[in-house]
A protein has these predicted regions:
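A generic alpha-helix surface/boundary motif
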Residues: 21, 51-52, 82, 105
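Short, charged/polar, low-complexity loop and linker segments
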Residues: 22-28, 111-113
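A ubiquitous short alpha-helical element
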Residues: 5-8, 35-42, 92-97, 122-123
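Active-site-proximal alpha-helical scaffolds that flank and shape metal-associated catalytic sites
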Residues: 65-147
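Short, flexible helix-adjacent loops and helix caps
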Residues: 27, 31, 55-63, 116, ...
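Alpha-helical bundle segments that constitute or directly flank the non-heme di-iron/ferroxidase center
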Residues: 11-16, 30-60, 79, 125-135
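Acidic, low-complexity proline/glycine-rich segments
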Residues: 1-23
Length: 147
């Protein structure tokens, strides 16, 4: 499968990301509060765009089964966004006034342009790297009893 080959060819990058001090700081709770608050705002902006892209893919789906898959994926992202809204309240982050940083803006613009202009295969391909990397983080961090 192409995705398996791409993952294998880029596994070193995924491993570097896993070892990044930011990821490790979130995992072990040592990340500075100000950095975590910034992350919450950026990730909430990202998650909203991610949910929108899934919703666009759902609307473009050729049949109800595919529609349901994308709809459920969007629902999962919205659940995660609710978690971030709770973090935002706890850390006094006003998500209504948060502006995306340059990297967040470029990535979310890419996702939304792809969603509006591409077919569902292209949309899924554009969204898959993030999902694969976060799944990798979750799997690897849980091996060390980090939820």
């Amino acid at each position: 499968m192409v995705s398996d080959e791409l993952w294998k060819d880029n596994f070193d990058l995924a491993s570097c990301c896993l070892e990044h001090p930011f990821v490790r700081g979130i995992a072990d709770g040592s990340l500075e509060g100000q950095k975590f608050a910034y992350y919450v705002g950026q990730d909430a902006f990202f998650l909203e765009s991610f949910a929108r892209a899934y919703s666009i893919a759902a609307a473009k789906s050729p049949d109800f089964s595919v529609f349901t898959t994308f709809h459920n994926l969007a629902g999962g992202v919205l659940e995660e966004l609710q978690l971030h809204q709770g973090y935002a309240r706890e850390w006094n982050v006003d998500l209504k006034v948060q502006q995306p940083g340059n990297a967040t803006r470029r990535y979310t613009d890419f996702l939304l342009v792809t969603a509006w202009s591409g077919d569902i295969g292209l949309i899924a391909s554009a969204m898959s790297p993030c999902m694969a990397l976060y799944a990798f983080f979750g799997t690897e961090l849980s091996k060390n009893c980090i939820p």
